[in-house]
Amino acid sequence: MLFGTYEHCMDAKQRLTLPAKLRNKLSNPIYLTKGYDADLEIWSKDDFLLKIKEILNQQNDQKDIRNIERIIWSNTVEIDIDNLGRIKIPYNLIQNLNIGKDVFILGLGNRLEIWSKNKYNQHKNQFIKNLNS
């Protein structure tokens, strides 16, 4: 199980070191994809395929299924964790989500999320504000 919040920095080559507690629970290859919010998600192969199957099984319309498949598969890359515990994040995923050098890595049970530090703080604060309203 993946859990916790970790603050890390991406290097100039768009590499991010995963916390040892998290990377020891993952094996190559892993799947990096756009999340539902302004984040990236990291999945193990088995969990990623289960999630895709679950999403597609909820759809009845073939057109919707094709569109969902396009969005998911075109925004997913298979990557490996290198021997130093780093992943290289493709530039297009960083640019599309405006993820900067400073990030949070969140463990969410069966996946990791990578957030821009500023965006995550804004997202979290807005959620807390809405809860208190």
From Swiss-Prot:
One of its GO terms (molecular function) is transcription cis-regulatory region binding. GO terms for cellular component: cytoplasm; nucleoid. One of its GO terms (biological process) is negative regulation of DNA-templated transcription initiation. Keywords: Cytoplasm, DNA-binding, Repeat, Transcription, Transcription regulation. Gene3D superfamilies: Transcriptional regulator MraZ domain (3.40.1550.20). It is found in: Cytoplasm, Nucleoid. Signal peptide: none annotated. Residues 5-47, 76-119 form the SpoVT-AbrB domain. Belongs to the MraZ family. Forms oligomers. NCBIfam families: division/cell wall cluster transcriptional repressor MraZ. This is Transcriptional regulator MraZ. The gene is mraZ.
